[in-house]
Regions:
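Short beta-strand-centered aromatic/proline hotspots
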Residues: 19-37
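Intrinsically disordered, low-complexity, charged/polar segments
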Residues: 45-74, 110-129
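Short glycine-rich, low-complexity/disordered patches
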Residues: 76-82, 129-134
Length: 134
């Protein structure tokens, strides 16, 4: 069995085609027979329902301070703190604003978080809400 790069709920940028270009979409499944991810978003739902595309047409979305703030993360003492309702103090810090380190409280948890889907996987692994907007 292959390890999947993306899981259900991940937000990604997908190259749809010449006329449409690329769109932000949500991974809703994986078809192992054709090795394609199944994606949807408002545009895809209106026109086709869902689409299946190969991994080479998917690009991770860079995790930025703007995206964190849009999702309720608050900057305090050099860390962005998670708005989760479960009470876990998940914090992110970055020297560059694009490569992040995760902490539980002040204890290191994971480094090299580069994309929205990386953060979603971390939150999923902690049993926290992984829904995000970009």
């Amino acid at each position: 069995m292959n390890d999947l790069k993306y899981i259900s709920g991940d937000l990604v940028e997908a190259w749809i085609g010449i006329n449409t270009g690329s769109l932000v979409a949500e991974v809703v499944g994986y078809n192992p027979l054709y090795q394609e991810y199944i994606l949807t978003n408002w545009y895809i739902e209106e026109t086709r329902g869902v689409i299946s595309i190969t991994e080479d047409r998917i690009t991770p979305i860079s995790l930025t301070p703007k995206i964190l703030e849009k999702n309720g993360w608050k900057l305090s003492h050099g860390f962005y703190w998670s708005p989760n309702e479960e009470g876990a103090a998940v914090g992110l810090s970055s020297q560059t604003g694009y490569v992040w380190k995760a902490y539980i409280g002040r204890h290191p948890l994971r480094s090299n978080i580069n994309s929205v889907s990386d953060l979603q996987h971390l939150l999923f692994g902690l049993g926290l809400n992984l829904e995000m907007e970009v």
